[in-house]
Amino acid sequence: MAEEAYPLFQQAVNLQPQVDLFQANLASCGVFLGKISEAKAIYTRLLKRFPNHQRNHYQLARLEKAQDETHLQQMLKVLEQTNNPPDRNIFIYFAIAKEYEDLGRWSEAFEYYKKGGDAVCSVARYDVKEDIELIDTIIRCCNKEWLNEPVTAAENSSEPVFVVGLPRTGTTLCERIISSHSEVETLGETLFFQMILRRESGVQSTQPISREMIEALLDKEPAAIAKGYMEQVAYRLHDKAYFIDKLPFNILYLGFFAKAFPKGKIVYLHRNPMDACFAMYKQIFTWAYKFSYSLED
């Protein structure tokens, strides 16, 4: 959707160039389209106006490999002058860490990655035990016997392809490769399948998915799940034979996907666990994948 959004952000900037949020959105969208030099110019210009804006420092640091300490020293100065508590420094911690890593200063890089991760953990209210219990429930419920039970499959004009795996394992690259085929389109990362599972389970919960939902879904008609999902994505489809949904968290729901879409495809990306975990540890996912901010989790 970045192709459609970019000219709209350009129009917003042209109409109100003094609004820094419009310019930041234009730069962020441009990164998705490979407009790196344009994005760099925007972030550099914004930081001249707002030198303490941590998120813009973070976005600028991500654009290219640091060749010297110029930007790094600017960020260290911001950190020293603002004197914020750790949970207000998350973006600049990760930005500083990234540039230290670019410069081969490994111990300093790890120090700041840890500061960033610890700061997120201090406010995240996350307990890894809950995720482990959910995964154990899925393994117990979505077993071989259940998967082999006969089902009535829904007929669809377009079949889904789930591209799944931990973040930073190559799901985005895989999505781009597959979607380059003329008979494939991509929806990007959506929550549609999870939403349908929540609805069909009939379980009321504040959790995105719960053990109770998983257990309740075992007796639900896979065809109803397929129908509900296809109704949700219909407005995004354009008469291609296949479409991709690449939300990494869909890996939890592959059993229900396999039963709902016997003709659907699953592409699972696997990467060396150490590489995958450390790559996640270095990334800000906003409030997703809370386990990634602690090496213990």
State what each model feature region is.
Residues 1-236:
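Alpha-helical solenoid repeat scaffolds of the TPR/TPR-like class and their adjacent stem/linker regions
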Residues 33, 187, 192-193, 197-218, ...:
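PAPS-dependent sulfotransferase catalytic domain
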